[in-house]
């Protein structure tokens, strides 16, 4: 399954952009939940895709912060 944005594209983002992208995806997830509750959602597969993207971005964010705090 090919996502609209891949992990390679996420790795190019800096920490501020990652945070903005996470916020945007969480808003999208909220909107999907609202549509599902009102029975307007036909594309339930988007839950899995967005959750996976959020998890990937959170992992990248933690890795970047760990690499910045670790002395070489």
From Swiss-Prot:
<protein>
    <recommendedName>
        <fullName>Large ribosomal subunit protein uL29</fullName>
    </recommendedName>
</protein>
<dbReference type="GO" id="GO:0003735">
    <property type="term" value="F:structural constituent of ribosome"/>
</dbReference>
<comment type="similarity">
    <text>Belongs to the universal ribosomal protein uL29 family.</text>
</comment>
<dbReference type="InterPro" id="IPR050063">
    <property type="entry name" value="Ribosomal_protein_uL29"/>
</dbReference>
<dbReference type="GO" id="GO:0006412">
    <property type="term" value="P:translation"/>
</dbReference>
<dbReference type="InterPro" id="IPR036049">
    <property type="entry name" value="Ribosomal_uL29_sf"/>
</dbReference>
<dbReference type="Pfam" id="PF00831">
    <property type="entry name" value="Ribosomal_L29"/>
</dbReference>
<keyword id="KW-0689">Ribosomal protein</keyword>
<dbReference type="GO" id="GO:0022625">
    <property type="term" value="C:cytosolic large ribosomal subunit"/>
</dbReference>
<keyword id="KW-0687">Ribonucleoprotein</keyword>
<dbReference type="InterPro" id="IPR001854">
    <property type="entry name" value="Ribosomal_uL29"/>
</dbReference>
């Amino acid at each position: 399954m090919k996502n609209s944005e891949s992990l390679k594209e996420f790795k190019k983002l800096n920490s501020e952009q990652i945070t903005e992208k996470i916020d945007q995806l969480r808003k999208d997830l909220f909107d999907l939940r609202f549509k599902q509750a009102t029975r307007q959602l036909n594309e339930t597969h988007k839950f899995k895709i967005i959750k996976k993207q959020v998890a990937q971005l959170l992992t990248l964010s933690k890795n970047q912060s760990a690499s910045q705090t670790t002395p070489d």
